[in-house]
Amino acid sequence: MAKYNEKELADTSKFLSFVLRHKPEAIGIVLDREGWADIDKLILCAQKAGKRLTRALLDTVVATSDKKRFSHSSDGRCIRAVQGHSTSQVAISFAEKTPPQFLYHGTASRFLDEIKKQGLIAGERHYVHLSADEATARKVGARHGSPVILTVKAQEMAKRGIPFWQAENGVWLTSTVAVEFLEW
């Protein structure tokens, strides 16, 4: 595996997140319903758009991402973002799964007033993202400011018929979390 510096890996990861989660049309690629993009076409379109992207760099980002944001298809010809999509091109069919008793959501303190009014909503994404542990939720919340960890009564939600899914990178997903299922 070729050597890349941390900035190059982080910049490429952000670029891939933008294109594979939110705006594939920004470089002229089309994702299938499961979010897959042909790697050769992705690299070519990225280069035409002025982004330095090679197969080796892409593979390094996939292999070294601590959050496992991306995955290769079984034949190695395609790549996708595992979760976090806002583009209408993608509707990944996750298998429904029974959650643990509690899940966690990391946010910034400045969002608490709104969350107390409406609960957790997906916003522009397809799902609300939840963590299985407080440490991961804290890291997520810290990206947005002073972190606050909310506890989600996940099993109680599931018992009331609210579905949960788990992405292959371990992130838990649900459509919304009503205020009654949150602990501050």
UniProtKB/Swiss-Prot annotation:
Its EC number(s): 2.7.1.-
Statement: the UniProt record of this protein carries the keyword Transferase: yes
Keyword Transferase: yes
Annotated keywords: NAD, Transferase
Molecular-function GO terms, alphabetical: NAD+ poly-ADP-ribosyltransferase activity; tRNA 2'-phosphotransferase activity
Biological-process GO terms, alphabetical: tRNA splicing, via endonucleolytic cleavage and ligation
Protein family per UniProt: Belongs to the KptA/TPT1 family.
Function: Removes the 2'-phosphate from RNA via an intermediate in which the phosphate is ADP-ribosylated by NAD followed by a presumed transesterification to release the RNA and generate ADP-ribose 1''-2''-cyclic phosphate (APPR>P). May function as an ADP-ribosylase.
Protein name, entry field: Probable RNA 2'-phosphotransferase
Species of the source: Escherichia coli O8 (strain IAI1)
Organism placement in taxonomy: Bacteria, Pseudomonadati, Pseudomonadota, Gammaproteobacteria, Enterobacterales
